[in-house]
Every structure is written in structure tokens, then in C-alpha cells.
Design a protein with these regions (language model features):
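Conserved N-terminal entry element of GNAT/NAT acetyltransferase domains
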Residues: 6-32
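Acetyl-CoA-dependent GNAT
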Residues: 25-28, 36-50, 56-130, 141-143, ...
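Alpha-helical elements of the RecA-like P-loop NTPase motor core of helicases
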Residues: 32, 80, 168-169
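C-terminal "cap" of GNAT-fold acetyltransferases
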Residues: 118-120, 154-157, 161-168, 172-200
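Active-site acidic-Proline motif in GNAT/NAT acetyltransferases
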Residues: 128-134, 162-163
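Short coil/turn segments at alpha/beta junctions that flank glycine-rich nucleotide-binding fingerprints
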Residues: 134, 151-154
Length: 200
């Protein structure tokens, strides 16, 4: 498998009730937490779309600890993690909890679909399923846009499932617009995806 593969991500929501959080880069010590959140978030949003064997194959490919560790170590991938303060939306015994994360990738997988000179891809934007609507995704999106601009990229690209209308509206509010129709494979099932881009 090619490192730092593209992934679909579910819709995230408003800033209204954003919990206290710390944004920081990923380290290899975060591998297990990232793999678990990736699986849980993807399944919460999309599990019903797939045959069990296709879903199992995709999760093994994309969210095994080996795959996630490879992406953390890959210089092409840039992760930013949102961790709770201990005791604030935390884990057991008041420990800190991984609330969500975003992953950027350069070079983008989608350069052939755009005339942008140096686009970057937003490959994952995941939050804990029980914290949807708390503004965590918005905070991570704000970080991703600022990071892309700070690195001098002229566009940021992402793919979204054609049937995920809530996510499409979320991205459109940030100024993303469709530039192409593409495919996304989960096991042996191909889904219709929309490629979105925002010029920076």
C-alpha cells in the first residue's frame, strides 16, 4: 500500500460548544489512539454502506497500527491532534482523550484534476463520534487552512462521498467547491466521490 493514502471523512460541525483542547503534532506514541479513532469514526459514518468483507479489508489497509505508524513517520503527511485537557471530555479516570485529528498530505493525490501550482490534500478530518457538533472539526479545519497557507500552497483539496450532503455543506461554508468526479474504493466496492478544492 502506498503510504499516506487518501481517506474519506465524515462531516464535522460548528464551533458553538467547543471543549477545551490542545492541538499538537502526532508522534509514534499516538499510533494506537489514532488507529482506534480512525476505525470508530469511519464505521460510525459509513459502515452501513458496505459488505462486511469490504469494510474489513479497508479497515485493515487504512487503520491498522502498522499503516497509521507509517503515515506518522512519512514526511509527506502532516498530522494535528486535538487532545482534551485531563478531566475535560476526557477518558477514564480523568485522563486526556483524543478528540479528533486532521491529516494533510503533500504532494496532493489529486494534482491532475487542477491547474493549481502547488496544492496540498486534506486526507482525514475525524472526531470522536460522540462529540460530533462540538466544534472540534471546525478547529481542526481552521488549523489546516492556516497551515496550508503558511506553507505557501495555493490550494487545498479533499474528497467527499457524493451522498454525504451534510459534509458537502460543511466544506462549502469554508469556500470549497467541486472540481471533479472521482472514485473511492472500500474493498471491492467503488463509491462515487466529489473532489473539492479551495484556492488559498
Amino acid at each position: 500500500r502506498a503510504p499516506c493514502m487518501p481517506h474519506r471523512f465524515p462531516c464535522t460541525a460548528s464551533r458553538a460548544t467547543r471543549p477545551p483542547m490542545i492541538l499538537r503534532p502526532a508522534t509514534l506514541e499516538d499510533t494506537a489512539a489514532l488507529a482506534e479513532l480512525g476505525r470508530e469514526s469511519f464505521c460510525a459514518a459509513f459502515e452501513h454502506l458496505y459488505r462486511p468483507e469490504d469494510l474489513h479489508a479497508f479497515l485493515a489497509q487504512a487503520y491498522s497500527q502498522e499503516a497509521v505508524a507509517g503515515e506518522i513517520a512519512d514526511d509527506c503527511c502532516i498530522h494535528r491532534l486535538a487532545w482534551s485537557d485531563a478531566g475535560e471530555d476526557g477518558g477514564e479516570n480523568g485522563s486526556a482523550r483524543l478528540l479528533g485529528y486532521v491529516k494533510l498530505r503533500h504532494p496532493s493525490w489529486y494534482t491532475e484534476h487542477s491547474d493549481a501550482a502547488d496544492p496540498i490534500a486534506l486526507g482525514q478530518l475525524y472526531t470522536q463520534p460522540d462529540l460530533t457538533g462540538r466544534g472540534i472539526g471546525a478547529a481542526l479545519m481552521d488549523w489546516a487552512l492556516a497551515e496550508a497557507r503558511g506553507r505557501g500552497h495555493d490550494a487545498i483539496q479533499l474528497s467527499v462521498w457524493s451522498g454525504n450532503f451534510g459534509a458537502q455543506k460543511f466544506y462549502q461554508r469554508y469556500g470549497f467547491a467541486k472540481i471533479a468526479d472521482i472514485g473511492f474504493w472500500v474493498g471491492e466496492q467503488r463509491d462515487d466521490e466529489l473532489l473539492y478544492e479551495k484556492r488559498l
